[in-house]
Amino acid sequence: MLWKRTCTRLIKPIAQPRGRLVRRSCYRYASTGTGSTDSSSQWLKYSVIASSATLFGYLFAKNLYSRETKEDLIEKLEMVKKIDPVNSTLKLSSLDSPDYLHDPVKIDKVVEDLKQVLGNKPENYSDAKSDLDAHSDTYFNTHHPSPEQRPRIILFPHTTEEVSKILKICHDNNMPVVPFSGGTSLEGHFLPTRIGDTITVDLSKFMNNVVKFDKLDLDITVQAGLPWEDLNDYLSDHGLMFGCDPGPGAQIGGCIANSCSGTNAYRYGTMKENIINMTIVLPDGTIVKTKKRPRKSSAGYNLNGLFVGSEGTLGIVTEATVKCHVKPKAETVAVVSFDTIKDAAACASNLTQSGIHLNAMELLDENMMKLINASESTDRCDWVEKPTMFFKIGGRSPNIVNALVDEVKAVAQLNHCNSFQFAKDDDEKLELWEARKVALWSVLDADKSKDKSAKIWTTDVAVPVSQFDKVIHETKKDMQASKLINAIVGHAGDGNFHAFIVYRTPEEHETCSQLVDRMVKRALNAEGTCTGEHGVGIGKREYLLEELGEAPVDLMRKIKLAIDPKRIMNPDKIFKTDPNEPANDYR
């Protein structure tokens, strides 16, 4: 009995972990599960199962002189409990708040260590106010941070190995990290929610190169900071193109993180269909390459699918191999106007259902056409101010293209179009498509020229193609009734559309919020999604829960904490991982 009382006294100051401790005492706190078990964890494991008081006493004495203190051990054990190893999903209520570093002296020391990783050269980091502001918000962002929500420093690494060292230091010191590339996202994706201790890692300055081009295999490996327009320019010289075309300024890393698409997605797919492999640095600094270069593989889990669309919450993508597509031998642009948005949307649905293969199918409402004229963003300012469809029609020869034009025209006429214009040459093709590419900027420029305080709420939803005309028509009526400046742009071929709403006052902001809420719920009721390509970020977390339900979101949370148990990667995005998250309305 004496040895039992002795054991009880020895264990009590450390923890009372019960059965869970026995199962998980040797858990390694890293993004992957490899590596050796430290001596303190081995002691704890064997102390519970030991049948000999002598052996127990020896191991306990050994622990007293080991590198780790009892407090360190307890901290690790408590973190295991938070991950909840028993269940397949993880509820927010089962978590405590993450233990980020807040000590200013220690933060300064970590920042100096991070600078040393980059050679302590001023061009490799910045804490200038203008840079901190630019890496926290944009005027076209839908959700804005408070003045205090700024990164502590911005780092500009040159290599994957430097990114690995940066993340290892941040992981070891519980410092939040926000990945950054083009900064064109719209739902607060790169907003630093944690005040005073966030590190922003920007790949755009130095990691923006082509690594390897395999023309015979139609793929290209690039660094994550390469703008997609630069990639397209590079490929164009070889008669090729990149399949995705998101907003101007977007970079490959952000395209992956946000699962971007754009106007060409109808023909070439979204980012997840255009990825072959990725190099990713996990939160603890582990470097992972998702696979080699096959166009298909059934080997193991689909790691590409896990990281595409993860919004920087699971790691930092540093390189990617993406598909190249052969440019159409012949292509034209057709512009077709309708009296109502319902007719225009119905035309898009009918074309999709007919099996006519088009390269792009875009819808702009009459308000957008008016704003394009008013902003003088294009060479011509006499666009018909009615709901308008823009088509890219391509093929292997002019004859094939002309036949497709006739088919599109026939469907458009069945849906009561009142004008049909198509480009006769390349210059006219660029002129006609230009109106589509400047849509967002036209809304911003047209109103900000009159009122500098104007802000824009930009959002998107996607619905099954058969529901597109109904949902877009109801959304249009709702926005028109609000009396706010608004416009709609749709990727009509895949049922995805965007709403642009301008506001100035807190009251108008609240009106915007209600309009967006009804728009999203309308899409969900039609079996659609709260976002087709903008992503969740901060702005649509509540809708993700409404769209999928608790169990899928709890599963995502489980995956997040399995890879990032310290919750350092882009905190508070997609779904909550802190039950005591600081309140902020992000206006």
Curated annotation (Swiss-Prot):
Q: Its GO CC terms?
A: mitochondrial inner membrane; mitochondrial intermembrane space; mitochondrion
Cite the EC number: 1.1.2.4
**GO molecular function list:** D-lactate dehydrogenase (cytochrome) activity; D-lactate dehydrogenase activity; FAD binding; flavin adenine dinucleotide binding
- Report if keyword Glycoprotein is assigned: no
Tell me the disulfide pairings in this chain.
Answer: none
Primary enzyme class: oxidoreductase
Q: Which GO terms describe its biological process?
A: lactate catabolic process
Q: Taking every annotated instance into account, which residue ranges of this chain make up the domain FAD-binding PCMH-type?
A: 146-327
Q: How is the cofactor bound?
A: Binds 2 FAD.
Record's catalysed reaction(s): (R)-lactate + 2 Fe(III)-[cytochrome c] = 2 Fe(II)-[cytochrome c] + pyruvate + 2 H(+)
The protein's location, in the record's own words, is: Mitochondrion inner membrane
Any remaining note in the record? Present with 10800 molecules/cell in log phase SD medium.
UniProt family annotation: Belongs to the FAD-binding oxidoreductase/transferase type 4 family.
Q: Which PANTHER family match?
A: D-LACTATE DEHYDROGENASE, D-LACTATE DEHYDROGENASE, MITOCHONDRIAL-RELATED
Q: Give the protein's function.
A: Catalyzes the stereospecific oxidation of D-lactate to pyruvate.
- Name of this protein: D-lactate dehydrogenase [cytochrome] 1, mitochondrial
Q: What organism does the record attribute this protein to?
A: Saccharomyces cerevisiae (strain ATCC 204508 / S288c) (Baker's yeast)
- Gene from which the chain derives: DLD1
